[in-house]
Amino acid sequence: MRNVDAAGLGIGDDYPPRLMGVLNVSSESPYKPSVFDEPDEAAAYVDGMIEEGADIVDVGLESANKRYEVLTAKEELERLDVALETIASVSGDAVFSIETRYHEVADEAISRGFDMVNDISGFADPEMPRVCADHDVAVGKMASPPDLERPGAVDDVDWSVRRSPAWAEQASYVDNVYESLRLNGFTDKTILDPAFGGWSERKTLEDDRETFRRLREFRGFGRPLLVSINRKNFLREVAGRDTDGALPVSLAATAMAVERGAHVVRTHDVAETRDAALIGKEFARRRVRDPGDVSVEELDVTTAAEARRHLDRLDADPAAADGAVTRVFEFEGLAPEDREALVAAAADTGAVVAPAETGALLAGSPAALRDVAASAAGSEALAAALERLPVGDAY
């Protein structure tokens, strides 16, 4: 996993989770507590976030809400002075990020005091990577189509043209997000954002929930991950909460996101989110990381789909993913002949069966378990149980 240096702030597996507080100088922003148009008031708000634990402050010049017309680069530049006056008045120490989709705005902001860029259009402006690389700054890249006016709308891309009809037919929403992050490449200091939130009319809350379930897959890029999940609808709906009551679900999801590999959490609730992120980091899996002459890193892989993402990055055979993960299942209520059938079926597959008095423990790779299911010569009840094993591509 590549670490990123953002103006001296380390981001990645070797560092604590980083908190990105939010300041908006756009009156259109839907979250009014973070909106300021007076630099002194804005600076006081930012100092408060820094005291609460914000490592990064993300400054938005316009609302990303799809209900509003997109500002031009010229209009964003007209709002930049307020943002610059604000950061000049801040007494606390933080990395300042400018949220923009335009390379002209990024160039001006970095030249005049900002430390990094947060591009919600995913390098739809083809000059954005060059500007960020020339300034040697970190840049957040959100999954997005190559369209400056439709950030995050990855399900609006015609993937049958961009990839192939066959690929598009079998691809899931998460596959679309993953492919969108590939578009237009990366800089050496790119941080990836899988675009949680209502970025298009076609996107569903379940799309976001599935992306969250499969968050570890995005570690396959080998780059730090940024998540923006604070009080989002896909979490609120689970618990039946409105925005004001959504802090507890946001904190629960924050701990889970960090445990699953997120490195930066964007939030309006800095103090509370800091604690949740630290809990997630504390209970994340401890993995081998040895940077010797021949480096060794244990990957955080729990499914074949996650393994396949890493194999893709390495340009290695994706078929190896089927043997990269072990699944363990307990069977109960097996007749003696079914226990014997399991043992016999597993003998030549690489799976392991540990028979017990009325059941058995079955362990193996998804490929081995599929072979067991195909060859076991037991009862109809055993065949039905084996057929229900979740050992397809997503597992």
Model-derived segments and spans:
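N-terminal amphipathic alpha-helix/helix-capping segment at the start of soluble metabolic enzymes
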Residues: 1-26, 285-322, 341, 387-395
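Active-site-adjacent loop and "lid" segments of alpha/beta metabolic enzymes
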Residues: 18, 31-32, 36-38, 44, ...
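Alpha/beta enzyme core
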Residues: 40-57, 89, 93, 107-116, ...
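Short glycine-/aliphatic-rich beta-strand segments at the starts of folded cytosolic domains
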Residues: 319-335
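Conserved, mostly hydrophobic/aromatic
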Residues: 23, 49, 53, 117, ...
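Active-site rim beta-loop-alpha module in soluble metabolic enzymes
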Residues: 179-206, 311-323
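Conserved beta-strand positions in the central sheet of alpha/beta enzyme cores
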Residues: 55-58, 97, 116-118, 140-141, ...
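C-terminal functional modules
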Residues: 353-395
